[in-house]
């Protein structure tokens, strides 16, 4: 079926279907408070939704390819659905053919059509920034917009390299904030660009714009960020290479103006979503949980590395791969955790997981220091301060020192607090995980935004034994 219906921002969206008897979450303007309380061990086997990063990229590259792309395991959360709608608005055919199964008929590199209305990305910074890159290489203009949270987030770091490639920001808010109009380049220029921070979004936007440029586009990173765009570009037929640059960095080189070919993509389970049941199982005494097909790309598994350093029992089996992305079954058992120091160079591989890591650190014995978290300040909320606030209201001793987070673990969490989510899905899920093992229940002021990335989170956690009411 084509993408139809009313979405969170007045745009089109498909109806989401749940495999659970519980109602799946969809975002609304009405707050949805929820309380989480300890209810014994968590047990069972589940598959968390498809990886959000892969889902966005599969839709975008499918739209830029010639021929048909079939995607299975797509994350059907609001963020990804907004990317699907944008591809449809730009001229690609996008259809849902079954549960988590989608078909994209592409228009080719630089083949996007002029959209008739603004591209509304809701809460999705990833979708918005990647599509900016794809549009920058096309001779069209497009209005980019989103919800109040996305409108507050800076876009200048993305726009600077795109303007060097010939795109123009015709109008926009201070700091390149949404809503803005982007005029793509009629004759895009290849560039060599050194990213100011380790950011897969900056890198990906430049590479997607570079597809339409003649010659070679190069991105240099001093710290390697997640490499899903590079792997998927290769899967679709692009000539792209990645080599080591310095101690921790990468140099990525893309030959422009390829003909990408439609491909089949199997989306692995999202490690950023798996992080929540993983930590819940570690802190709820007696738990034994299995998660299937979780992506184990080493540039995404910083959380699992850190948890193992803390003493976590996380076992991998049934290792396999698809489109260059490795995946495995994870068995997680409740563990006694200890405090550790997390180095700043690990941040790019787990930037979305620090919130739930802070929950794990609260239940550990000893001090956990997480260094170099400046990127958390420009997410859906100021996640660094919001994480500290979440812990404090539940009786955890925590300190923000510059861009570092210091958590004093005492082996248990008093709980009893109400957590303000600041319209941030990961704060909501992290707080609910905390309540699975805290002494007193934890209340979350609004769970509606969980729908952006993990619409089936609440029924899935309940199926493992969590008590949310």
Swiss-Prot record:
Q: Specify where the region named Disordered lies, as residue ranges.
A: 21-45
UniProt cross-references to CDD domains, sorted A to Z: EPSP_synthase (cd01556)
Q: Which residues form a coiled coil?
A: none
Which keywords, in A-to-Z order, does the entry hold? Amino-acid biosynthesis, Aromatic amino acid biosynthesis, Cytoplasm, Transferase
The catalytic activity, as recorded, is: 3-phosphoshikimate + phosphoenolpyruvate = 5-O-(1-carboxyvinyl)-3-phosphoshikimate + phosphate
Q: Which GO terms describe its molecular function?
A: 3-phosphoshikimate 1-carboxyvinyltransferase activity
PROSITE patterns named among the record's database cross-references? EPSP_SYNTHASE_1 (PS00104), EPSP_SYNTHASE_2 (PS00885)
For binding 3-phosphoshikimate, which residues are annotated in this chain's numbering? 52-53, 57, 199, 201, 352, 379
GO BP of this protein: amino acid biosynthetic process; aromatic amino acid family biosynthetic process; chorismate biosynthetic process
Residues where phosphoenolpyruvate binds: 52, 125, 153, 201, 383, 426
Keyword S-adenosyl-L-methionine included in the entry's annotation: no
Q: How does it assemble?
A: Monomer.
> Which NCBIfam families does the entry link to?
aroA
Family to which the UniProt record says this protein belongs: Belongs to the EPSP synthase family.
Q: What is this protein called?
A: 3-phosphoshikimate 1-carboxyvinyltransferase
Query: What species does this protein belong to?
Result: Bradyrhizobium diazoefficiens (strain JCM 10833 / BCRC 13528 / IAM 13628 / NBRC 14792 / USDA 110)
